[in-house]
Amino acid sequence: MKLRRILRAARPFLGVIALLGAWWVLAASQLFDPVLLPSPWKALLALIDGFANQNLLYDFEVTIWRTTASLAIGCLIAIPLGIILGSNEDIYRSLEFVVDFFRSTPTSAMFPLFLVLFGVGDKTKIAVAAFGASLVILFNVAYGVMNSRKTRVLAARVMGASKVRVLFDVYAWESLPQIFVGMRNGVSVSLVIVIVAEMFIGSSDGLGRRLIDAQMSFDMPAMYATIFAAGALGYTLNWIFLSIEKKFVHWGGK
């Protein structure tokens, strides 16, 4: 029984151990050039060194700031708009093509437009990431409102609630689980777009810029360390929103 409990507790780490083990075997066998595939230990040392000398830490913080800012802007735009669109089918149907069109357009294809509008700098990176995140959040919020319980809406109207009260006291709460789903998806989209923008839109800092610099200089341990940092950041942000969702909308679907 004790062994079974230990195995159950270790289960989430088995995939990580298997991945590191496979990486170690490939690096030790030298099937690939050791310069291109260093050992996990070298990548770990590069990660520790990057945080110790604060170079990687600074880029990490810059990417967090850009991701957080873009997500906040996306939420401020998409959540109220999604509630309004979802509560009025006529308005939603009239704008459905526009929303789906831009949602289906690769955000990277919008880089030139945002560069023209905002120039080279943080504004462009944050704006293009906010654009991508807002579309994901908007779709989820509108979907949550459209699938809200009709009985609660009718009950509010019978009791004399105005359209505004129904909008914010019924639809907003009914769509809250989908709002959090949209925010979780939105923060992932924001992070991806921010890192890609840092790589290709004239940036001097951030994890994306650090990745490109390491790749161009063939500093493979630093490149893998930055990939680890970006992956850890994405996982942590998703975990934070999932934890908040479980705490505050545990009643979802009940």
Predicted regions and their residues:
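Transmembrane alpha-helical segments of polytopic membrane transport and secretion proteins
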Residues: M1-I17, W239-K254
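Periplasmic/extracellular loop-to-transmembrane helix junction in inner-membrane transport proteins
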Residues: L3-R5, S29-A72
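Non-cytoplasmic
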Residues: Q30, A129, G182-A232
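Loop-to-helix entry region at the N-terminal start of transmembrane alpha-helices
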Residues: Y58-R66, V116-I137, F180, A222-T226
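Cytoplasmic-entry segments and transmembrane alpha-helices of multi-pass inner-membrane transporters
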Residues: P80-L115, A129, F139-Y143, S148, ...
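C-terminal transmembrane helix and the adjacent membrane-cytosol boundary/short C-terminal tail
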Residues: E89, M146, P177, V181-R184, ...
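Short cytoplasmic-facing helical segments at TM-TM junctions of multi-pass membrane proteins
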Residues: Y143-I179, L211
